[in-house]
Amino acid sequence: MAKADLDKDPFDVASMFDDVGKNYDLTNTVLSFGQDRVWRKRTRQRLDLKPGEKVLDLAAGTAVSTVELAKSGAFCVACDFSQGMLAAGKDRDVSKVVGDGMQLPFADNSFDAVTISYGLRNIHDFRAGLKEMARVTKPGGRLTVAEFSTPVIPVFGTVYKEYLMRLLPQVARAVSSNPEAYIYLADSIRAWPSQAELAREINQNGWSDCGWQNLTFGIVALHSAIKPEN
């Protein structure tokens, strides 16, 4: 996948993440200055899971996010298109399923809630992905999307863009087995919709009542919505 090619071929994306699975969690912690742990906890809290609920964690990668969700007592399923990523998390005691975000291997109305963290950008057609997540969610069920977003403080936003363009690729080359994956990450973040634009897309593709919460000055935003009852 070329540096500036954000028209994502699913198999290119899967192969890219297969290559980084072994060191993925450590690399993310380094690149986020340890904020990834905070963001996972806040995602769990935002989803407001109850013991016994059935939850889909899409684009779960090594399932570190799924383990965090499972602290709620819910039954959590990790689903990812990258077999290499799921294999890297083989020792994490949660259910794991290989699946494409545009054609999920689950029946209609299977889950009480669904979440996707930093993976919606990587679905070939993210609008189709939103509709597919709605399909497998029960009426009245919840969605939380954790995704990199637009910083809300202008000066901080300028610093953040400089980090994405200059420092992140350099750090990735030092700590990642596939730095091109993180160059793609930086490019895709810059091309991603703002908080308000993404909320509008979510409301137009299978969900309703979407709102969001900014984390770390808007570097990350948690978008939450409900699947309509009818």
Curated annotation (Swiss-Prot):
Task: Look up the record and give one Gene Ontology term from the biological process aspect.
Answer: menaquinone biosynthetic process
Q: What PROSITE patterns has UniProt attached to this entry? A: SAM_MT_UBIE (PS51608), UBIE_1 (PS01183), UBIE_2 (PS01184)
GO terms of molecular function? demethylmenaquinone methyltransferase activity
UniProt pathway: Quinol/quinone metabolism; menaquinone biosynthesis; menaquinol from 1,4-dihydroxy-2-naphthoate: step 2/2
Q: What is its EC number?
A: 2.1.1.163
Q: Which residues bind S-adenosyl-L-methionine?
A: 62, 80, 100-101, 117
Gene3D superfamilies under this entry? Vaccinia Virus protein VP39 (3.40.50.150)
Keywords (A to Z) from UniProt: Menaquinone biosynthesis, Methyltransferase, S-adenosyl-L-methionine, Transferase
Q: Which family does it belong to?
A: Belongs to the class I-like SAM-binding methyltransferase superfamily. MenG/UbiE family.
**Name of the featured protein:** Demethylmenaquinone methyltransferase
* Species this protein is from: Corynebacterium glutamicum (strain R)
